[in-house]
Amino acid sequence: MAEISVTFEDGATERFPAGTSAAEALRAHAARNGALQRALKRAIAARTDGSEPAVIDLARPLFADCRLAPVAPESPEGLSVLRHSTAHLMAQAVKRLFPQVEITIGPVIENGFYYDFRRPEGFTPEDLARIEETMRAIVREDLAVAREEVARAEAIRRFRAMGEHYKVEIIEGLPDDRVSLYQQGEFVDLCRGPHVPSTGHLAAFRLTSVAGAYWRGDARNEQLQRIYGTAWARKEDLEAYLARLEEAKQRDHRRLGQALDLFSLHPIAPGSPFFHPKGALVYNTLVQYIRSLYARYGYTEVITPLIYKTELYKQSGHYDLFREDMFLIAVEEEEYGVKPMNCPGHCYLFATRKHSYRDLPIRYADFSRLHRFEASGTLAGLVRVRSMAQDDAHIFCTPDQLDDEIERFVAMTREVYAAFGFDRIEVTLQTRPEKFLGAVERWDTAEAALRRALERTGFAVTVLAGQGAFYGPKIGFDFRDVLERSWTLATVQIDCAMPERFELGYVTPEGSTATPVMIHRAVLGSLERFIAILLEQTAGKLPLWLAPVQVRLLPISEKVADYAARAVDACRAAGLRAEADLRGEKLGYKVREAQLEKIPVIAVVGEREAAAGAVAPRREGAAEAALPLDDFIARTVAEARMPGGAS
């Protein structure tokens, strides 16, 4: 009988008959290794590092030499297996409770999983509770999970007999002659695996929500019911995650936007937020802050059209690649596109004048509104919208200026994130994808420039090979928030295609014409999305300089209302955004309401303060000593100064 060599984590190598399962090989070696025995008791899968590295079922037979290790449930690979198996567990419970339901797909996602079902009447919260109860019953049954490979035609026959038409459609689209099925008790599913050895390994899970989803993500197809869940290796991990979820609900920018009267969303304009006066003030103050940086970093602001003939996007290359995400309009037998990005218009703007190398770099900044068609099912508050503005800019420079421009952008990004206390930044370099525009040589030069700039900045960088945009490599700055979520904020990309497509040029010192380098860059990205992230990061307690109401005066009684009103006027004259609560409510009520509205500075005014021309400040719920009004205003003005000293 043929034999294979298996090397274990401790470096030892043993020989086994071909076809020995991963579990058998691990158990045999564990008999001589106490540490491996303990690891194997908790293992839910195995990791191989042979000709085809993979995480596999413990029961999977081995037919080639490999390295082999157990996979612990709390490891990243183990959590993926747990969550995938819990998705199957949920589907089995749904089929037990609702036999007429058809199953579709159930992948792993960040922190959990989902499964899509066809059930026209949908699922209620009561249904989810019953499904979860049935899942726990199946866990107690500790059903063995078995893998089987069958001919594609046989798999089609089986699923057709079960009435699982979506599975039949999936299998018919697979290129392989054989497919793998997984079975636990009466439940069978099409799956590549791997999975836990038995359902008894799945103890820490919770179903979290249900939502609509279209089959294959296409709105033209039938709507399905998507049940989301989460699964963890330990119950304490699950409880910690659920606590974070509850915290996320309290920090949800949609809830805060309504509670703080910042913005609202309405069906009349899907994906296009209404910014209320307070929200517009936050929005415009952000723009003012970025404009103050533009003045220091040498940007010139431009205003470009909102609607262009689609010839522009055909020339830029966006029409073929981005058309499905555009709002297109037919007028006077011409096709127009509502602007989804600024870069083609900035190329046209650059071409309106002849440029010398002495003119470069040229840095165009643009806060124009952009519109992109996002499917209705993907819209999410301010995070995913159809109407937005960005702190968008495009730089046209010579090749010799490229490194310096990237470093200047990184410096500006550092300054902005420091202003908001965003200190957990991870940097990625995204390189040439399979489908790209422009010459390979331009891509290589651009990627090298980005690498050099990052090396000089001192950031630790993760390279994401093949994940650049179709027109150029990209640096992304990912911010990890208080809820451990990662958000891509700043991006800088070198365009390897558009300058040539628009035949852009500048006169060199030798008098010849050369193509400029074009850089796309944004620090905040979408202003709408940045506001959402900032609200959730701060739980609505915006920095003093950005708060829509910076100071609220609270008179104790009507006797001092006139003084409170005069104090507000003095605050406003000094540039503070101040107001007074002149209602006849009790002081405690007014203080509590101001705290709920996240007012940064509260100042109480009683008869003693009015007589002395003073106020009694309160911050973070704590009372401070009374201050003369002028001193209070001076201190607050200094604290409310915009970062970087801008006014």
List the predicted regions and their residue ranges.
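NTP/phosphate- and nucleic-acid-binding module
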Residues: M1-T104, E110-S647
